[in-house]
Amino acid sequence: MNILKKFVVMISVLTLVLFGCSSGKYTDKIDKAVKLQEKKQTKIAKRDAGDEVKHFDKKDANIYVYDKGKYVILAYKPLSDDEEVHYYTYEFKGKKAKYKENFNSKGYYQEHDPDYKEENMR
């Protein structure tokens, strides 16, 4: 019985380690997309001076990674008095990230299964 307990504990620990590391694979890409979106949101807020959220905050956004890290989609509410969610896609080529301006981010999100997702939006 003692050997069985050790085996179950070992399997449980390995499972936790494997699931805990799944986001680590995309951490760099997510961080780059978040930094770019922070800059983008700050510019939008300065330019429009309306009800735009002043800063992008990762903890208020949903993050989706697709195609083995090729695309990172950030979904959040950029307007303080509006519940509409906006989707922003960053494409990665090598280590470089670029915002995809004329890309149907919401459609892509709806039609594809993410490799990784982090849903923080309230």
Kindly give the residue locations of the regions a language model identified.
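C-terminal motif of bacterial Sec signal peptides marking the signal peptidase cleavage site
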Residues: L16-G20
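Post-signal peptide N-terminal segment of mature Sec-exported envelope proteins
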Residues: K29-D48
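Solvent-exposed, well-ordered amphipathic alpha-helical segments
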Residues: N2, K40-I44, R122
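Bacterial signal peptide processing site
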Residues: S22-K25
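Intrinsically disordered, low-complexity segments enriched in glycine/proline and serine/threonine
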Residues: V8-V9, S80
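Alpha-helical transmembrane segments
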Residues: I11-T15
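Bacterial N-terminal signal peptides that target proteins for export
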Residues: M1-V8
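Extracytoplasmic electrostatic interaction patches
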Residues: A49-R122
